């Protein structure tokens, strides 16, 4: 886990040498991500966030006045580092009364969640193939905990694969 200051994008979170989020444009991603689900179903009683360690999706759910937010995050260190160095993104979402953090493997944790619990589920995992396959493998579990007419919004990899970076900043 690294926070690097990039000239064009400001501070950015890197995990395993891959950029995850940058201060300069994060709000566009998180706002669009949350609002795209709300455009399909405006119910905001209860949301689940799978991943999203930078806190941007949690911040947007809070700003949209969700009643309750269960945030399933594998690594509390990612959240802590982002709270410390990218505090404008998450705005200390973990400290809000409406947010309950569940640390560990999200897909193991949701096995104990009752059916039809969430109005919205936001799957905000890394872009790597492992996370994409993991989310796809567990889609039926996500559907089980989703209320009727609920919406799953998922971050998916671009259709365009870029094999080599043009420039690496360290």
Task: Show where each model-derived region lies.
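Single conserved hydrophobic/aromatic residue that forms the stacking wall/gate
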Residues: 160-170
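The AdoMet/dcAdoMet-binding core of the Class I SAM-like
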Residues: 21-159
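Short polybasic amphipathic segments
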Residues: 10-16
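A structure-centric signal for secondary-structure junctions around beta-strands
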Residues: 9-10, 44
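Short, solvent-exposed loop/turn motifs
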Residues: 2, 19-20
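N-terminal auxiliary segments of SAM/dcSAM-dependent transferases
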Residues: 1-8
């Amino acid at each position: 886990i690294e926070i690097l200051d990039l000239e064009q994008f400001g501070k950015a979170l890197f995990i395993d040498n891959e950029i995850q989020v940058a201060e300069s444009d994060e709000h566009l991603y998180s706002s669009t991500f949350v609002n795209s689900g709300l455009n399909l179903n405006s119910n905001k009683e209860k949301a689940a966030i799978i991943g999203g360690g930078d806190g941007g999706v949690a911040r947007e759910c809070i700003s949209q006045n969700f009643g309750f937010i269960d945030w399933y995050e594998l690594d509390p260190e990612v959240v802590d580092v982002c709270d410390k160095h990218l505090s404008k993104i998450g705005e200390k979402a973990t400290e809000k009364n409406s947010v309950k953090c569940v640390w560990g493997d999200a897909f193991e944790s949701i096995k104990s969640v009752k059916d039809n619990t969430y109005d919205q589920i936001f799957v905000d995992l890394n872009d790597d193939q492992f996370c994409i396959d993991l989310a796809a493998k567990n889609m039926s579990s996500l559907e089980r905990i989703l209320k009727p007419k609920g919406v799953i919004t998922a971050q998916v990899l671009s259709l365009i694969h870029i094999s080599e970076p043009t420039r690496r900043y360290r």
